[in-house]
Regions:
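Alpha4 helix (beta4-alpha4-beta5 surface) of REC/receiver domains from two-component response regulators
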Residues: 70-71, 84, 94-110
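A Lys-centered signature of the CheY-like receiver
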Residues: 114
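Flexible loop/N-cap segments at domain edges
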Residues: 183-411, 424-431, 441-459, 486-495, ...
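Conserved phosphotransfer microenvironments
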Residues: 59-76, 84, 393, 496, ...
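Receiver (REC) domain switch/output surface
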Residues: 121-132, 137
Length: 544
């Protein structure tokens, strides 16, 4: 390669070991590079990338205790700090399957195992740069958003039948899939498979068939591809999505469990798996996954308060299914988790999330009246766009406190956001649909119970009315009108069951703290006086 060309290329070397950096820098100088930048960690590397348009990045996988090479590459791609012609090569002494699969998934330009010699480094770097130069028009058009032009440039190279023909063929297939031209992609990939091209051609064929919803054919191809190291992760990802789209959520979850063992650093996949656990009503598994995400995302571009909040939300969901003692222990853990959260992230930036979480925490502790009071104090049904998980949690909080309007407000807000076409968004959309169906079913059930209780009261079957109003109040413990109806029916009875008394106590607490219209306030005082004489067990509540 022309020495003058190499002398003008900007190279960044990222390694946490100073002697290793010095050794590799010497090799780079021997190759002919003169503009060599060095970074000992990801923070320095990102800073250099922000200041300079680099042509080549040589990055160690293990960068110490902070962000590693995988996370750095992910960050640079996400922030668009790598221009279309920049070559990114990972170097590592690690050959573990987890690391190799993770690197394959991110698709750097090359991966070099340590230790390596000067001739090996030179050969690999020159090869990567030549390929990048030969394919530059494809990359430039693609990065500019002109997929059709990128395909045309790929065809030009394919017709030339030179040393980068295979790479151009692969890029063309990926461009067809990216553009959503699935029938054309299927025809193209089938031709490549018939020509015995590498295994990626068969994966492209499977994806194009899957996107046309021919699930049986796609399943067969994807299952075969799981046997190849190169496609072990991606084929299983698509296989899990296939089962998800078929409605087999348990099988999709099992496949993602295996994939996350192969390549654990992919945070969107971990979140998708947690969502599948929630859809399978395995709240304990979802909590474990979100706990794992908190650790895995640390130092990465995915590190956020939402990871901690999602963990806390899952603990509350799981606690609602547990026995009282286990529930108390679990909810105590939520408090500790929130303490850790506010030490790392500004409480002001997540004030609404924390408020909603406190409301749900009070509901889970059996204090719905306090929860409703807290929500009313900070209520803000605004068009502000919150994180998807925040909207779903807000919908749950409003439903649990009996505010159907507030619940559906956040359901609508969330639905507007779920417009991407990927596995994670699909799982979020199904979670929302499932929650909405649950709300609608409970709401219809409550309407029926209230009607049955009202009919019983009008027919002077007061004992029956109390039982049904009590059942309805357990489902909607923060509805003042329902609480008042229960107390009214109780004034007509000579006695109620032991199961009804806790519900009645909650009704009294709710009505004592809730802002009531004058007519409702007068009725409440009237019922209080009657009940204090009839039921001595309620007197402490009334004085409180």
């Amino acid at each position: 390669m022309d020495p003058d060309f190499l002398a003008l290329r900007r190279v960044l070397l990222v390694d946490d070991c100073a002697p290793v950096r010095a050794s590799i820098k010497g090799m780079l100088q021997q190759i002919g590079f003169k503009l060599i930048y060095q970074a000992k960690d990801a923070v320095e590397a990102i800073s250099i990338c922000e200041q300079h348009a680099l042509d080549f990045i040589l990055c160690d996988f293990n960068l110490g205790d902070c962000q590693d090479g995988y996370q750095l590459f992910e960050t640079l791609k996400s922030r668009q700090l790598l221009h279309s012609m920049c070559c990114f090569v990972i170097i590592s002494a690690e050959s573990q399957r987890q690391i190799v699969h993770g690197v394959i998934e991110l698709q750097p330009d090359d991966y070099i195992l340590k230790p390596f010699t000067f001739p090996v480094l030179k050969e690999r770097m020159v090869k990567v740069m030549k390929e990048k130069m030969a394919l530059r028009k494809i990359f430039q058009a693609s990065q500019g958003g002109d997929l059709a032009e990128a395909c045309r440039q790929a065809d030009v190279i394919i017709r030339q039948q030179n040393e980068v023909q295979l790479q151009a063929e692969r890029l063309k297939g990926e461009l067809l899939l990216q553009a959503g031209n699935y029938q054309q992609a299927e025809t193209y990939y089938q031709q490549l498979v018939n020509q015995r091209k590498p295994v990626w051609s068969k994966l492209g064929l499977a994806i194009s068939i899957l996107q046309q919803q021919r699930f049986d054919e796609a399943e067969q191809l994807l299952t075969e591809l799981t046997e190849h190291d190169e496609t072990a992760v991606e084929s299983r990802d698509y296989l899990a999505h296939l089962y998800f789209r078929r409605g087999n959520l348990k099988r999709a979850f099992e496949i993602l469990q295996y994939v996350t063992q192969l390549s654990p650093k992919n945070i969107p996949r971990q979140k998708t798996m947690a969502n599948l656990a929630l859809l399978c009503h395995d709240f304990a598994a979802a909590a474990r996954i979100f706990h794992k995400i908190v650790g895995l995302a640390r130092h990465s571009m995915h590190d956020s308060a939402q990871n901690y909040l999602n963990h806390a939300r899952c603990i509350i969901d799981n606690a609602n299914q547990q026995a009282p003692i286990d529930r108390a222990n679990a909810l105590g853990h939520v408090g500790k988790l929130l303490d850790s959260l506010v030490k790392r992230f500004s409480p002001e930036l997540i004030a609404f999330d924390l408020q909603i979480l406190q409301v749900r925490l009070l509901c889970a502790k059996g204090k719905p009246a306090e929860a409703k009071q807290l929500l009313a104090k900070y209520q803000q049904l605004t068009e502000q766009e919150y994180h998807p998980e925040t909207c779903l949690d807000a919908a749950k909080a409003y439903f649990e406190t009996g505010d159907i309007f507030g619940c559906y407000f956040y359901v609508t807000q969330l639905r507007k956001q779920l417009n991407k076409a990927n596995f994670l968004t699909d799982s979020q959309r199904l979670l929302l649909d499932t929650e909405q169906r649950r709300y609608e079913a409970l709401y219809q059930q409550l309407k029926q119970l209230i009607q049955q209780a009202t009919d019983a009261y009008q027919q002077q079957e007061y004992g029956k009315a109390v039982l049904i109003f009590s059942r309805a109040s357990k489902e909607m413990p923060t509805n003042p009108a329902l609480a008042l109806s229960l107390l009214q029916a109780m004034t007509k009875c000579t006695g109620v069951s032991a199961d009804t008394l806790p519900v009645a106590r909650n009704a009294l607490s709710l009505l004592q703290s809730a802002p009531l219209e004058q007519r409702m306030q007068e009725r409440f005082k009237q019922y209080q006086q009657i009940l204090s004489k009839q039921y001595s067990q309620l007197q402490n509540t009334q004085r409180g």
